[in-house]
Amino acid sequence: MNRPYKLTPMHQWHERHGANMAEVSGWRRAVDYGDLKSEVASIRTGVGLCDATPLSKVDVEGKHSEQMFERFTRAPGVGECTSAVLSQIDEPPAYIARLTRDRFIVLGGAEKGAQVSGLKDAASGLGCLHVTDVTSAYAALRLMGPMSTNLLKKLGPARIDSMKDGRCLQSPLAQVVGLLIRRDVRGVPAWLLLVSRDYGEYVWECVLSAGHEFGIRPFGTAAEQVLTDAEAADVEVV
């Protein structure tokens, strides 16, 4: 019997455009689009776009949220992000983005079930505090490459030029509400764009259209691994 798996909002787009698909951690994901070398080159010299929807996302909200994060690390300021180990199995560390005084988004880190459980344990006894798994509620798009910021400027985010690595901003993106997180990868400018799942494919296509002049290419998990793996990043792809 086949195991159940989840589909991202852009799944049908990937299939229509010839992606090689595989199951990764319970999700059907695009591994590549038939030309890994070109995908990696596009990211290194221009801009590439990846469907990162399966990335674990946990919403933490309430007036005691900062107090909870102070149990693990120095809580970031509003509009800032930081990495932190939130449990014994967080590898790599989780990434914490502070959206408002009382609201945070926690990305990655431990398998989301363990991460949600660990955060709820940490929140115990702190009063007004809510921890919610929102992984499937948001589409996540990873935009990487030296032209990524110029591309985003075409889609309307406010104050995009002033955003440095480790910053986050809630802003209209292609006319829908989005969350932008700047998280560079080994010196390569990179952004994570979170929008409501319902708008996922629409925003995906808007980004691709805006990136046409920059030679944008979609890339899959194979290219993502090459660019993010410390040992693989300097290897020539053939």
Predicted segments with their positions:
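Basic, glycine/lysine-rich polyanion-binding surfaces/domains
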Residues: 1-238
